[in-house]
Amino acid sequence: MKKLIALMMALLCVMSLVGCGGDVKNVKITEYTSEKYSNDEIKDAIDVAIDYFTKEFEGCTLTEITYLGDDENDDWQEFADRNNATDVIVLVSSFDVDASGGDGSLNPNSTYTNWKWILVRTDGGKWKHVDHGY
């Protein structure tokens, strides 16, 4: 029984050291205007990107995010096409990376700007994250 308790305590300690994902508590959502999407549609897309960042960008802090804009957004329609979707929305963000380098694919102690988030949906449904990066 003592071994089981010791094992459970050790497991609890290890789990407490595991990161909780990206930090989004102070993210600035920059104002945007669109003739293509409503404010609610854009906010829903931003929420999807923030949720993904929270889960997958351990050691990173999202500092700003916004809608790319109608004119540039249309250039990304191929993502909707290849994902059998009708709509695409592109967000742009900035985030800081701590000394850990996130998951190892990012430069430690750096800031990423103009980072794109590409989301698609079909016929006004829910946005789905399909890609991100430069």
Q: Predicted segment positions?
A:
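Low-complexity, compositionally biased segments
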Residues: K3, S16, V90, A99-G101, ...
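Flexible low-complexity loop/turn motifs enriched in small/helix-breaking residues
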Residues: G19-T111
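Sec-dependent N-terminal signal peptides of Gram-positive bacterial secreted proteins and lipoproteins
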Residues: M1-G22
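Short beta-strand edge/turn micro-motifs at domain boundaries
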Residues: Y112-Y134
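Residue-level signal for the start and early helices of compact helical domains
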Residues: M8-L11, K28, S110, I118
